[in-house]
Amino acid sequence: IMEFYDSIGVPRDVGSRPTTDHYAIRGLLSVHWLFDDDHDDAYFAGEDMSDPAMPGFAYYGNANGYDIWENQYYIPMGFSYDYYITRSEYNALNEGSENAIGDRELAMLRAIVIEDDRVQYYEGILEHLPESMRSFTENGYLQDCLDRRERSCSSFTYTNTGFTAQIDSTQEQIIFFSVPYEAGWSAAVNGEPVAIEKVNVGFMAVVVPEGDSVTIEFTYRTPGLALGFGITLVSLALLVAYLMLMNRVRPRPA
């Protein structure tokens, strides 16, 4: 995830706090609600609440000392793409800075970023983003959000070991989840194990077949946990055996 933030010019430390200039992050990461403290003068939409600092947000109400804003272009977790760009093409785009959005961030709502050596794998699943579609604007971002929402999961549920999602898939396609890619994750589609792809500079995706109510399940297990548990059991068994042996060979008092 640090690689992702670095790639779009957002400083990454103990907590990630992208400025409102980076509005496209909110779309990519499926942000639905924003809570703005009504006790300070750092207004999200100005004192008269008429000019939201990010496009697509509308005032919803106030509760417990917070003004609540809804992202009307919210994309549910788990959505698909029609197009891709390679990591090299992504790196060639404008990065942006801490207080300015760049083309890289906007591009990820229009085309999924795949590693250069995976292009052949996606033949027949994704199309290469045409040059004519490589102009990125605020209005274009809003339309891209609507397009992604059109092909998003119908349900997404966290579990004790990860999450599950369902989608009505009209064709074989790749489904993106804004969950950091790391060792320990495994995935299954309709109960069958599938490979997890690293996409969008550090997030996860899987390819799903055509079908109604396709079920996607991600499970996380701490890497090395089973091995560590096994080593602990073996060590304990050796300790018990050693103590029993020492007890047998210890000379008895006369």
Identify what each model region corresponds to:
Residues V119-Q120, G124-A254:
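Active-site-proximal, structured, solvent-exposed surfaces of multi-pass membrane proteins
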Residues I1-D147, T170, P180, E192:
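Extracytoplasmic
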